[in-house]
């Protein structure tokens, strides 16, 4: 394919390795960073941090360094924006968690995008601008789109990389997540990435992509807490943790798979809820540092309460009676032990004083209604 003119507004620990990778694939890469120190280091081929493979590419790169954003905009068809969205040091995981919470700081990102918008106003074309930075869902719509020219071609394309292996992760991703409403922009970026790898290209809305990025990161955190819970149980009960995790890792059908990743009711049946409660008892017996299993059951109850409230408020707003479908703990069975549907029915009984009917041809003879209802 014809080499593309690609720019990077930000040449830090994320932007520079990715820029070097595209340069190495033969694209014409332009880079600009507001830090004079960063620009000087790159010009002198100095990488002040360890990033596997990047120094070798920096030594032989043919990237053009732009000394203002106007020069960057004038030369590029695609501009990546890997500008940091920092957090207060209190929220970076090196100190104890407090009651306070905070969103990321978007000031640097907003300033960079606003600058690009200003520079583009003098052009007769609008390059595709691709934000890479991590943001929370709704941020781009709320914080950025309102200040931009309507012709501004904005996309969101966060990377799933880890510092230290940025170059390798960029070249060998699991997938490319791309949020945009611009069909042409998506096709151009898909063509660009095809010169680097053959990873699947997942296109969605910007807001969806914003959540997917942080959902991915926090899912990893959840796995680590679970694994460390197993480690602590094993340490305190004389069990081999490697044997436990090695066996669980073989469960590629239900555990290490997309199964159970769709939203819906909580888990049920004769094993899951009772096992969590039994393991919570064991956590207390062993004096675990954290009762992961109690958290699971509390989450199950809170989410069931939320679903019950959603059903009842929808019922009240529509002036239609609520009606539940499915009493068993899962489809195609008549077993009701541990059923989250029964838990929800009981919560509605407690909270609203309503004995809500449930139709399930496998468990009862409650007929399917003929009149309009709010079904759940």
Where are these regions (language model features)?
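Structural/interface elements that position substrates and couple domains in central-metabolism enzymes
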Residues: 2-376
């Amino acid at each position: 394919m014809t080499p593309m003119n690609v720019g990077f507004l930000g040449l830090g620990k994320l932007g520079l390795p990715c820029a070097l990778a595209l340069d190495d694939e033969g694209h014409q890469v332009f880079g600009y960073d507001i830090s004079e120190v960063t620009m000087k280091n790159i010009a002198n081929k100095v990488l002040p941090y360890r990033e596997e493979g990047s120094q070798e590419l920096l030594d032989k790169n043919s990237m053009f360094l732009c000394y203002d954003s106007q020069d960057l905009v004038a030369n590029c068809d695609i501009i990546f924006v890997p500008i940091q969205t920092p957090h207060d040091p209190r929220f970076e995981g090196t100190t104890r968690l407090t009651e306070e919470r905070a969103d990321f700081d978007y000031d640097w990102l907003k300033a960079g995008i606003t600058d690009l918008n200003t520079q583009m106003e003098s052009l007769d074309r609008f390059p595709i601008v691709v934000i890479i930075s991590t943001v929370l869902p709704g941020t781009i719509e709320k914080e950025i789109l309102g200040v931009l020219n309507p012709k501004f071609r904005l996309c969101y394309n966060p990377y799933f990389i880890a510092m230290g292996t940025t170059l390798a992760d960029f070249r060998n991703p699991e997938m490319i997540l791309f949020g945009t409403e611009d069909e042409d922009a998506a096709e151009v970026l898909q063509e660009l990435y095809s010169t680097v790898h053959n990873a699947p290209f997942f296109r969605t809305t910007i807001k969806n992509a914003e959540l997917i990025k942080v959902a991915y990161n926090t899912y990893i955190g959840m796995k680590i807490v679970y694994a460390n819970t197993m480690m602590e149980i094993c340490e305190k009960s004389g069990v081999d943790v490697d044997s436990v995790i090695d066996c669980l890792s073989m469960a590629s059908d239900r555990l290490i798979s997309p199964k159970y990743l769709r939203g819906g009711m909580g888990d049920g049946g004769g094993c899951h809820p009772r096992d969590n409660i039994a393991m919570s008892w064991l956590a207390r017996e062993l004096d675990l540092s954290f009762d992961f299993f109690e958290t699971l059951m509390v989450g199950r109850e809170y989410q069931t309460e939320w679903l019950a409230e959603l059903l009842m408020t929808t019922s009240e707003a529509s002036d239609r009676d609520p009606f539940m479908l499915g009493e068993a703990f899962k489809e195609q069975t008549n077993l009701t032990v541990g059923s989250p549907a029964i838990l929800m029915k009981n919560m509605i009984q407690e909270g609203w004083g309503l004995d809500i009917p449930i139709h399930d041809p496998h468990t009862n003879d409650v007929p399917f209604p003929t009149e309009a209802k709010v079904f759940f």
